[in-house]
């Protein structure tokens, strides 16, 4: 999709030009891969997170990446998304992306499998709502800001054979 060309009206509104820029990053003990990055012009994050069309676009790009990255097939893999905020109801961007990825590569998607015990965004504590039997897990986060969500998810799942952290937009 073509990015909307306008500058942010406020300092708070973040934008993405939707030009793919796959990058590897390190945060604490983990490495994560981002598909896109924040930009000075483009579509606002809030608009992106409300768009089913852009969820399909992000999922297609993620599948293309996964086909190149996961060698030997998807047997034993599943996908989860980082916990959704409790006050958000209705369309959920990450859930839509993960549903599309899971269908395309034929792996289980554990929707709402991880929940946050605290409201603290900088030091969240997560727990599993249900068991995840697969030992290889793709953890998807739509927009990374501080990285604390990925680190908390890592602490919860670090006993697994493989963890692949995939981020839609790196907001750093």
Predicted feature locations:
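Short helix-loop-beta junction
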Residues: 99-108
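A short, conserved beta-to-alpha structural element at the edge of catalytic cores
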Residues: 115, 154-172
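Short, surface-exposed alpha-helical segments at coil->helix boundaries
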Residues: 91-95, 99
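Short glycine-rich phosphate-binding loop at a beta-alpha junction
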Residues: 74-86
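Acidic, metal-coordinating catalytic cores used for nucleic-acid/nucleotide bond scission
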Residues: 83-92, 118-119
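Active-site-facing substrate-recognition patch
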Residues: 1-75, 110-136, 146, 171
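A structural signal for isolated positions on well-ordered beta-strands in alpha/beta enzyme cores
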Residues: 78, 138, 164-166
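A phosphate-binding catalytic loop at a beta-strand-loop-alpha-helix junction
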Residues: 139-153
